[in-house]
């Protein structure tokens, strides 16, 4: 496997001495004699707790990359190893506590052999799924040793050096993947110079990791050029998210997701649910989150018409009867949200926000428009019912008194209101860590505010977050071991003299059981949707 050094004409092969184009034509070939044309994009299997319900959502990031590559003439195939092997759950290395969901190696190998990719790209978002990514890299090397390999996603971006310890990996993509992947493909085919390729990490012939800075966020660039991809894409500073094609929905096995029906939100009205993003980025700076680090600190929106066009395409071509907005903060731009919700009313489909909304940018008018336009379920990511914890440890700009009013108002409109809470925040920036009493106060707040249901999570120091940096600095986690086994149901943060991770995990589990077991929270989404019809 080979990768351009992006700073010279030299290429490295599995840590062996560097080769040059043409030195090994049977493996690499010259750009003018071999075209890197066929791209296999893989979503890896998922390793989860035995008693978890595996949520199965579309790998939209791969869909966007596939759409851009196809626009420029590349042949693409998406294989969602997790979804296609959803019913194949196997213990992990003899550990009955965890199950791995996904296709068997034989099934994956069969797809690789039949497609014969020139390039294999793998999604690497979560650190606790890294083993599954590296297993796919091993299979790719065994089956298609001449193929070039790359990974991208949050884990890959924050740990490029560790990822490149894998001899089966050629490149790590940093940041947003659409333009980075496209320019890299064009570079492999000799259509762009080294200077035009950015956002990639690789090992040079001396084994040192080299990193080229990331491209600007996509809101400030636009690919232009012929559909054939026979010439280099041009960068324009006039573009925005609307210039990215819709995800390549035709490369997903849509019927498989409809059959599984394990969408991110368990409260669904329809059975054929579509998912989409209307924006990227966030203006908040929550310590546990990485959205601002990966997607930017400014909100980047798609136009209302572009969003509606995608919903209509999903409805008309794939028969969706419900859609979910995957944005972290769909109401961050309140004026834009109003326009969007009015347009959703014309679409006439039920919809939900399982990822959450920006409650600090929410009012009664927006909730009215949401209910009128078909929103039957809304998720409010409160994080804590204690103002001190929000301000000093989480840094989320919420006023809990105002938030309580909005929760009750949304319930009065007939919407199911789900809450997200995090417990077990350690000392941060000189502020005292969250006490057990404050965690109980969060639970009490959820009860008093009137949530229909709630999820309580043990604080998890995910890669790239301020929380992780503080935990490492203060010795509250072991980054060499904990991060690769971390889930939101495990407590891996240990604060001596205050509490340990196991205690927090048990408390979160108790809160979830107690809060959601109440009979008066029984909920039938179809009845709620019927009640909201306009």
From Swiss-Prot:
Pfam families given in the database record: B12-binding (PF02310), Radical_SAM (PF04055)
- Cofactor or coenzyme needed: [4Fe-4S] cluster; methylcob(III)alamin
From the UniProt record, give the pathway where this protein acts: Antibiotic biosynthesis; fosfomycin biosynthesis
GO MF annotation terms? 4 iron, 4 sulfur cluster binding; cobalamin binding; metal ion binding; methyltransferase activity
Protein name, UniProt field:
Cytidylyl-2-hydroxyethylphosphonate methyltransferase
Domain called B12-binding: residue spans = 38-195
Q: What is the effect of changing residue 282 to A?
A: Lacks the [4Fe-4S] cluster
Q: What does this protein do?
A: Involved in fosfomycin biosynthesis. Catalyzes the C-methylation of cytidylyl-2-hydroxyethylphosphonate (HEP-CMP) to form cytidylyl-2-hydroxypropylphosphonate (HPP-CMP). The C-methylation is not stereoselective and the ratio of (S)- to (R)-HPP-CMP is almost equal in vitro.
Note from the entry = Was originally thought to catalyze the C-methylation of 2-hydroxyethylphosphonate (2-HEP) to form 2-hydroxypropylphosphonate (2-HPP).
Question: Which reactions is this enzyme annotated as catalysing?
Answer: cytidine 5'-{[hydroxy(2-hydroxyethyl)phosphonoyl]phosphate} + AH2 + 2 S-adenosyl-L-methionine = cytidine 5'-({hydroxy[(S)-2-hydroxypropyl]phosphonoyl}phosphate) + 5'-deoxyadenosine + L-methionine + A + S-adenosyl-L-homocysteine + 2 H(+)
User: Which CDD domains does the entry mention?
Assistant: Radical_SAM (cd01335), radical_SAM_B12_BD (cd02068)
Which EC numbers does the record give?
2.1.1.308
Which Gene Ontology biological process is one annotated for this entry? antibiotic biosynthetic process
Q: Which family does it belong to?
A: Belongs to the radical SAM superfamily.
Effect noted on mutating residue 286 to A: Lacks the [4Fe-4S] cluster
Question: Which intervals hold domain Radical SAM core?
Answer: 268-496
Residues annotated to bind [4Fe-4S] cluster: 282, 286, 289
Q: Which SUPFAM superfamilies match?
A: Cobalamin (vitamin B12)-binding domain, Radical SAM enzymes
Q: How is the cofactor bound?
A: Binds 1 [4Fe-4S] cluster. The cluster is coordinated with 3 cysteines and an exchangeable S-adenosyl-L-methionine.
